[in-house]
UniProtKB/Swiss-Prot annotation:
Cross-referenced PANTHER family: UPF0102 PROTEIN YRAN
InterPro entries: Restrct_endonuc-II-like, tRNA_endonuc-like_dom_sf, UPF0102_YraN-like
Disordered: annotated segments: 11-31
Full protein name: UPF0102 protein Veis_0630
GO molecular function per UniProt: nucleic acid binding
Organism field: Verminephrobacter eiseniae (strain EF01-2)
Name of one Pfam family that matches: UPF0102
Family classification: Belongs to the UPF0102 family.
Length: 144
């Protein structure tokens, strides 16, 4: 399913009010949540189970992990969801540089310290770009 189609199928707000804005007028936050919803649906259809969503480290300067999922073999998968409206400047994947990777790795290390025995894990990226199918990049980067 393509992102704009998915965004258009989101359920309306429970409170009565004006009609939902068309996909093109959605706020950045709404588009981000819709992209995460679409990525999650894609990963769950592949058999992964949601463990956490929008995990944030406490304090300033930390990181956030969009989705934490578990595979059938118990591998913990930290997922960064990237959303872009077009392919300019590298598209959805073009904004995952070294700084962003370090923040995700930092957040994952913080998350893993809470567990009694850290399982195998990896870092995936799901790219959601308007008018394109969802792209899932397994093991997109590694903790150094």
């Amino acid at each position: 399913m393509k992102f704009l189609e998915f965004l258009g199928k989101r359920p309306p707000a429970a409170a009565p009010g004006p009609a939902p804005a068309p996909a093109s007028a959605a706020t950045a936050s709404e588009r981000g949540h819709a992209a995460e919803d679409l990525a999650l649906a894609h990963l769950q259809a592949a058999g992964l189970q949601l463990v956490a969503r929008n995990y944030r480290t406490p304090g300033r300067g930390g990181g956030e992990i969009d989705l934490v999922l578990r595979e059938r073999d118990r591998t913990l998968v930290f997922v960064e969801v990237r959303n872009r409206s077009h392919g300019a400047f590298g598209g959805a994947g073009g904004s995952i540089g070294a700084t962003k990777q370090r923040r995700i790795i930092f957040a994952a290390q913080h998350y893993l310290r809470r567990l009694p025995a850290p399982p195998p894990c990896r870092f995936d990226v799901v790219l959601v770009q308007e008018q394109e199918p969802v792209q899932w990049i397994k093991a997109a980067f590694e903790a150094q």
